């Protein structure tokens, strides 16, 4: 689960991290009043969406007057912001962050992720702030400095000092950086974060460190024990189909192709998408129905897939392990009848009672195309989509 910038900064402030004075606003009038409370001559106004690239898309501006801030809010609130990280529809803007402007002397990067290989939290720091860290890692990896935190021990001050030295910080800046590092390390573990970024972490003209931006991603599997963070969830930033799928414990990700995919198992789902691509098709989605491919869940999966008007055919690829293929076949038939599927459906069954499952499909009165293999299934569904 992602947080907005203003929410991330609220958490930063709780852990004693320096953040600009700012106010999250729901209306143009609130933005106008917030600008009046900020003492700096210039105010920064930012659209709050779960996507990067806001500045280049016009979602971040600098204004001298309260009226300018209000006009920005009037322009964006209730509209969608399209960036390079969103789809063509963009993300809805429901809040505007109004902040004091900062005198920036230098920009740094500070972030943290869970390293599954070492089972530790790895902090990354760089002098190349304000740009995508992926680009820095690719072009100049030597400029990224790391510190691994043992979750049983927690962040250590010496690790923060080492990073500060490598960033070229001096004097009181080192103390400030260590405080930020220690706070973030504690926050990361306490709130079950999966990713944390401050980009940029700036050095102001006065020589102080300031968290100018914030990005937080929380491990969704840990939300059951993070009630405070659950309340920060913004459903407006999610694809409607993905949100509906989550209610049925279906893992769904919308894509831009025309072949709907319904599979049990994330690895098999990715393999299915690959082979559809290999045979000239374009997947319309990733959908993992999991181990419980019941009639009800399959029916909901069909509804979600077919809510995308671009879908011209559906490939159902099921491996029967604990669940028998004949039972799955009956569930598919029932779901197709219930939903009233109007596009070609190709089904490939493999595993326990696979032959019996294919026989059940063949003897049904539902128009389902049975496939003998994964390659056969991909070829048939691509051909069906092209003919539609």
Curated annotation (Swiss-Prot):
<dbReference type="InterPro" id="IPR016102">
    <property type="entry name" value="Succinyl-CoA_synth-like"/>
</dbReference>
<feature type="binding site">
    <location>
        <position position="199"/>
    </location>
    <ligand>
        <name>Mg(2+)</name>
    </ligand>
</feature>
<dbReference type="Pfam" id="PF00549">
    <property type="entry name" value="Ligase_CoA"/>
</dbReference>
<dbReference type="InterPro" id="IPR005811">
    <property type="entry name" value="SUCC_ACL_C"/>
</dbReference>
<feature type="binding site">
    <location>
        <position position="264"/>
    </location>
    <ligand>
        <name>substrate</name>
    </ligand>
</feature>
<dbReference type="GO" id="GO:0004775">
    <property type="term" value="F:succinate-CoA ligase (ADP-forming) activity"/>
</dbReference>
<dbReference type="InterPro" id="IPR005809">
    <property type="entry name" value="Succ_CoA_ligase-like_bsu"/>
</dbReference>
<dbReference type="GO" id="GO:0005524">
    <property type="term" value="F:ATP binding"/>
</dbReference>
<keyword id="KW-0436">Ligase</keyword>
<dbReference type="GO" id="GO:0006099">
    <property type="term" value="P:tricarboxylic acid cycle"/>
</dbReference>
<comment type="pathway">
    <text>Carbohydrate metabolism; tricarboxylic acid cycle; succinate from succinyl-CoA (ligase route): step 1/1.</text>
</comment>
<feature type="binding site">
    <location>
        <position position="99"/>
    </location>
    <ligand>
        <name>ATP</name>
    </ligand>
</feature>
<comment type="similarity">
    <text>Belongs to the succinate/malate CoA ligase beta subunit family.</text>
</comment>
<dbReference type="GO" id="GO:0004776">
    <property type="term" value="F:succinate-CoA ligase (GDP-forming) activity"/>
</dbReference>
<dbReference type="GO" id="GO:0042709">
    <property type="term" value="C:succinate-CoA ligase complex"/>
</dbReference>
<dbReference type="GO" id="GO:0000287">
    <property type="term" value="F:magnesium ion binding"/>
</dbReference>
<keyword id="KW-0067">ATP-binding</keyword>
<dbReference type="GO" id="GO:0005829">
    <property type="term" value="C:cytosol"/>
</dbReference>
<feature type="binding site">
    <location>
        <begin position="321"/>
        <end position="323"/>
    </location>
    <ligand>
        <name>substrate</name>
    </ligand>
</feature>
<keyword id="KW-0479">Metal-binding</keyword>
<dbReference type="GO" id="GO:0006104">
    <property type="term" value="P:succinyl-CoA metabolic process"/>
</dbReference>
<feature type="binding site">
    <location>
        <begin position="53"/>
        <end position="55"/>
    </location>
    <ligand>
        <name>ATP</name>
    </ligand>
</feature>
<keyword id="KW-0460">Magnesium</keyword>
<dbReference type="InterPro" id="IPR017866">
    <property type="entry name" value="Succ-CoA_synthase_bsu_CS"/>
</dbReference>
<feature type="binding site">
    <location>
        <position position="213"/>
    </location>
    <ligand>
        <name>Mg(2+)</name>
    </ligand>
</feature>
<dbReference type="InterPro" id="IPR013815">
    <property type="entry name" value="ATP_grasp_subdomain_1"/>
</dbReference>
<comment type="subunit">
    <text>Heterotetramer of two alpha and two beta subunits.</text>
</comment>
<comment type="function">
    <text>Succinyl-CoA synthetase functions in the citric acid cycle (TCA), coupling the hydrolysis of succinyl-CoA to the synthesis of either ATP or GTP and thus represents the only step of substrate-level phosphorylation in the TCA. The beta subunit provides nucleotide specificity of the enzyme and binds the substrate succinate, while the binding sites for coenzyme A and phosphate are found in the alpha subunit.</text>
</comment>
<feature type="binding site">
    <location>
        <position position="102"/>
    </location>
    <ligand>
        <name>ATP</name>
    </ligand>
</feature>
<feature type="binding site">
    <location>
        <position position="107"/>
    </location>
    <ligand>
        <name>ATP</name>
    </ligand>
</feature>
<keyword id="KW-0547">Nucleotide-binding</keyword>
<protein>
    <recommendedName>
        <fullName>Succinate--CoA ligase [ADP-forming] subunit beta</fullName>
        <ecNumber>6.2.1.5</ecNumber>
    </recommendedName>
</protein>
<feature type="domain" description="ATP-grasp">
    <location>
        <begin position="9"/>
        <end position="244"/>
    </location>
</feature>
<dbReference type="InterPro" id="IPR011761">
    <property type="entry name" value="ATP-grasp"/>
</dbReference>
<dbReference type="InterPro" id="IPR013650">
    <property type="entry name" value="ATP-grasp_succ-CoA_synth-type"/>
</dbReference>
<dbReference type="Pfam" id="PF08442">
    <property type="entry name" value="ATP-grasp_2"/>
</dbReference>
<feature type="binding site">
    <location>
        <position position="46"/>
    </location>
    <ligand>
        <name>ATP</name>
    </ligand>
</feature>
<keyword id="KW-0816">Tricarboxylic acid cycle</keyword>
